[in-house]
Amino acid sequence: MMLGLVMSEKESASEVIFRIEDEIAKSEGNFDSIFVSLKERFNTAELSTIYSLLLGGIKAPNFLRRLICEIDKLREKRNLDDLIDFILDCDNKNFSEPAEYLNLKVLCIKVISNYKEIKAVPSLLYCLNDRKANYKLRLAAAEALGKIGDKNAVESLIDVVSDEDEKSVYVRESAAIALGMIGDSRALDAFVGILEAKKSFLNKFTFLKERILESLSKMDFAGNRRALNAVKKALEDESPQVRINAIETLMNSQMDEAVGMIKKMLLDCDVEVRKNAVIALYNLLGDEILEEIIQDETLSEDCKTEAQGILDGDFEEDYE
């Protein structure tokens, strides 16, 4: 490779790009030698500058994908601005397949989230709130906001998760997950409202309720009667997975009523729900409740088998 003069003061940015574009054309999709050569010749600051030029000028999707991953490894702050510019750029770089550009933007957002820099939040909020954008981009933006954890994103995430007109339930799910990661109590009312809603689509597509219960399990709602009643209602949901998630939420709630509610689930019609109730009670009460379950003649054999298995240590890793 002829990359020795890439940082020459006599070379313009366009010449740098042209030089590496020539190497890309010869590489046949294997870009290892290009990046190995760059890393051998240039220090971190110089690499950051080169990566910035390449991200702004190269149009080869496969190379850009590798470049974005290399930027993630380098994680220089100056390249964060480059990544933000990339996701906000409306130009599709003349890609023959628009899906390629979309996938690169989604990858950029994931890398941006790894920086965990608050300065990226406004741009991510823009992506999240852009109803014309592909749902994959908005979903990635929601997940990134949760990972960064800035509470300035909470209101927008609440708006998305509460929006009954939102076409993509997946975006609402991602917003719910992000709110759980941030852990701000302002989301409680929105979560409870959705669990209380009698919407037919929620019964058909239960994933949103599942995600909300998962997020509630990470939040402190002790003393919030409305939230407790909503979780209690979820124990009666038609979906076994919703009932399982409600059990886990109660287990993590540290509320006095939790044990009694979970004990009732030992009589649930679904075997997996019953097993999860056993596990939850063990996590709350220890070995003593397992002995009680084994001796209880009113309980099913699967409950007893699950309890005995935990006592015997057969599935120890599952309960740690």
Predicted regions span which residues?
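Alpha-solenoid helical repeat scaffolds
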Residues: F35, L53, L64-D72, N79, ...
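Hydrophobic core positions within HEAT/HEAT-like alpha-solenoid repeats
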Residues: D32-V36, Y51, R65-C69, I84, ...
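Alpha-helix N-cap/helix-start positions at coil->helix boundaries
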Residues: E28-G29, A60-N62, L102, I118, ...
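Amphipathic alpha-helical scaffolding segments comprising HEAT/armadillo-like alpha-solenoid repeats
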Residues: S8-E21, R41-L55, E76-F95, E117-N129, ...
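Alpha-helical adaptor scaffolds
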Residues: T206, E214-K218, R225, N229-E236, ...
